Amino acid sequence: MTETPPPPVQQLADERTAARAAKDFAASDRLREQIAALGWGARDSADGQVLTPLPPYPVFASVQDLPDRSGEPDARRCTVALLVDGWPQDVRTCVEALLTHAPSDVVIVLLDNGTPDAGDVVHELARHERVEELHVERAAGWSQARQALVRADVAAVHVLMDVSTVLEGDGIGPLLAALEDPAVVGAGWRGVDVVDGWLDFADAGPGPVEALLGYLLAVRRAAALAVPLPPKARFYRNADMEWSFLLREAGLGSLVAVDVPVRQDRHRGYHDSDPVLRDKESKKTYDRFLQRFRGREELRLPR
């Protein structure tokens, strides 16, 4: 049911419509701010101005508008970053398990990536002192959103975690312990090695691996800033493996898979995404990976 704006909001909206018709865009912007101050949002559409109640939390226009704290020193030990693309119950399950099992100094950051249905749950979960929230209006691709989370972080260790990954014990502490070795740049739950002439990957680990999957992947924040996630990767699939090789190519350290107590629930990114988009973007990423790394045997691990 559409909520009817109160008379003061409607009056400002009518004035804004007139200002836009007169091409007085400065007045239009000023009136939009006045409408927002009354708790309503004014959005322009092909059918005219649309008024909707604003949510009880700030919403950035896009991930480019999120705070950039990349120049700040480390201020905490670890952040677990969750990219929320919907499925609020999955988000709740993942976060509640983190709060139960992860070390008490680990902070959880949720990025509501332009979702129509998960923002309120993200806001509710952020009432917990260890949970922080970010909301954007326009959804971003996987790597773009993930790198924005890295830039907004101030932890020494940044953990990429998919909401389908659910802790059944402390799955974060062992990753942090692995990163105490200065020769290790990243630690994760699932590792893989190249097989079949670089045309496929096979499960590997525990121990040193050629690539880590992004279901649960801890990396030093400094490394994630120095070697960003592949910017052309709009979809998650294969982008984590491409990034793994980029980190190792840069000589920033080794990657290790660690046996941790987690389970994977339904992976929405794969099973519930548009299959045409999924296959197209996955192939583009893997083709880019092959073009850069195929034949680079110095990046292979002896088995």
Regions found by a protein language model. Name each.
Residues 169-200:
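Conserved donor NDP-sugar-binding/catalytic core segment of glycosyltransferases
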Residues 136-153:
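Glycine-rich, basic loop-to-helix element that forms the pyrophosphate-binding segment
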Residues 63-75, 185-188, 193, 206-207, ...:
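C-terminal, non-catalytic tails of nucleotide-sugar-dependent glycosyltransferases
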Residues 214, 226-256, 260-262:
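Donor nucleotide-sugar recognition loop
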Residues 112-121:
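A conserved acidic beta->alpha catalytic loop
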Residues 155-166:
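Short beta-strand-to-loop acidic/aromatic patch adjacent to the donor-nucleotide binding site
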Residues 96-105:
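Short, acidic, metal-binding catalytic loop of nucleotide-sugar glycosyltransferases
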Residues 200-222, 236:
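A recurrent flexible, glycine/aromatic-enriched loop bordering the glycosyltransferase active site
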